[in-house]
Amino acid sequence: MSRRNAAEKRPVLPDPQFNNRLATMMVARLMKHGKKSTAQKILSQAFGLINERTGGDPIELFETAIKNATPLVEVRARRVGGATYQVPMEVRQERGTAMALRWLVNFSRSRNGRSMAHKLAGELMDAANEAGNAVRKREETHKMAEANKAFAHYRY
């Protein structure tokens, strides 16, 4: 890794099928062992199932689900004089979105269901309705930050 300067962040191009940047990011999180076409198929099937069940626009529901699962604050460990404090910090938008996508995929994988598409569709619909494990994780993260508010002055 170069010490000279940080690598330039490449822009995320919108997904060719859904014309959506978040869909591209979701495909990247779903992908295992470089199998991008399989990940795209899973997302497309999940959107099909969402459309079937709700009758609404799956992209709209997907964006709502991500918004509902995105944390605004998190706690980070900070050592001060031999003690480790959980310091609450604001989450940048990019990191928040990445965390939400990661949680949605991980909790989808741990769900009981037939296929990954069914599990992902279920988790996305739950998140859009402010339920589900990803939203619960966000609330948990916010509670932790609220409980450790006293250490906010240790922010770096």
Curated annotation (Swiss-Prot):
Q: Which Pfam families match?
A: Ribosomal_S7
Molecular function via GO: rRNA binding; structural constituent of ribosome; tRNA binding
User: What GO biological process term is on the record, naming one?
Assistant: translation
Q: Which is a Gene Ontology cellular component entry for this protein?
A: small ribosomal subunit
Keywords, alphabetical = Ribonucleoprotein, Ribosomal protein, RNA-binding, rRNA-binding, tRNA-binding
Could you confirm whether the keyword Glycoprotein appears in this record? no
Top-level taxon of origin: Bacteria
Report the family membership.
Belongs to the universal ribosomal protein uS7 family.
The record's listing under PANTHER family reads: RIBOSOMAL PROTEIN S7
Query: Whom does it interact with, and what assembly results?
Result: Part of the 30S ribosomal subunit. Contacts proteins S9 and S11.
What function is annotated for this protein?
Answer: One of the primary rRNA binding proteins, it binds directly to 16S rRNA where it nucleates assembly of the head domain of the 30S subunit. Is located at the subunit interface close to the decoding center, probably blocks exit of the E-site tRNA.
Q: What is the protein named?
A: Small ribosomal subunit protein uS7
Species source reads Prochlorococcus marinus (strain SARG / CCMP1375 / SS120)
